């Protein structure tokens, strides 16, 4: 059997419990085809780089899998059918990483300090005065 890393993105408007149910469903698909899920990581709700199907955020989930190709094909087929899955990618790897992934240790773009603070912005009149070279 081959080793795979699989990441899928679920819609932002579903509850975290529904994401866990999706994970459980795909885990059962893998196990029913003779594979096993070695590790899962739920990266939580994160911002997307661009909108996907009108979603600006998504629930990210990583699955480390040891399974035959038929199990992966069936899981991907079911993901294509499910409307809650925005994107997925499966990559074959030589070995699985033992420590937690870099995504878990990296803060989300929304977590940076000062993001929600409003910065003072000059009014249009103040801006025009600065551009013209003189301040009244």
Swiss-Prot record:
SUPFAM superfamilies given for it? Ribosomal protein S6
Q: Pfam families in the record, alphabetically?
A: Ribosomal_S6 (PF01250)
Source species, domain of life = Bacteria
Annotated region Disordered: the residues are 97-136
Q: Name one GO molecular function term.
A: structural constituent of ribosome
Which biological process, per GO, is one annotated for this protein?
A: translation
Q: Which HAMAP family match?
A: Ribosomal_bS6
Q: What is the recorded name of this protein?
A: Small ribosomal subunit protein bS6
